[in-house]
Amino acid sequence: LYTPERNVWLANSLLEVQPSKEGKNLFSCSKKVNDYLKTTVMGDTLKILLDYPLDQLPQEFKKSKFMGMNIGDMRLDMAKDVGGIINDINSQNIGFKHLEKDSLSIATSNSIVVDSCDFAALQVIRSGGNVDFQSGTINNLYFKLGMMGNLSVNVEKCHIGTEYLTAQYANVQLQKGECERMIWIP
């Protein structure tokens, strides 16, 4: 939440994305934040909005210009037909675990961790924070390097076939053995 008078963010929050065991999308969060989430479905898109009324802030925070809310983690059990994740909740990182998908696009203003996932194609459109590939297989990885922070790949446990890289005004260090082939797209 941002207004000229106040900047509110989620402190230490993680959106954990994992495969759905029931074949449908399920979203869960802590009870204390559930009353302030508004969800709407627009076509094939689930939009989740954190709407905390600033007039209900505890008295000790009413004069604070900056405030981190500690609301706990959120989880999305994702069905196979989901093609993209967009998350712009300020300071909420995303962790992907045990996903097996043909393709997925990710856009976030925060950090991403990919662990034990298999993708035929993964596109990181934007990540304002770090991108950390811990383990898994990605046949084709598409990056816009200028739209992300640091990139890290555990070369012992994460196998990347081809990286398709594009950037403007980017400074990202690529690791030796990070992928089999790298294609630069100016």
Spans of features found by a protein language model:
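Extended, compositionally simple hydrophobic/Ser/Thr-rich segments
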Residues: R6-Q18, I71-P186
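Start-of-domain marker
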Residues: L1-D44
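Membrane-embedded segments
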Residues: L26-I71, D81
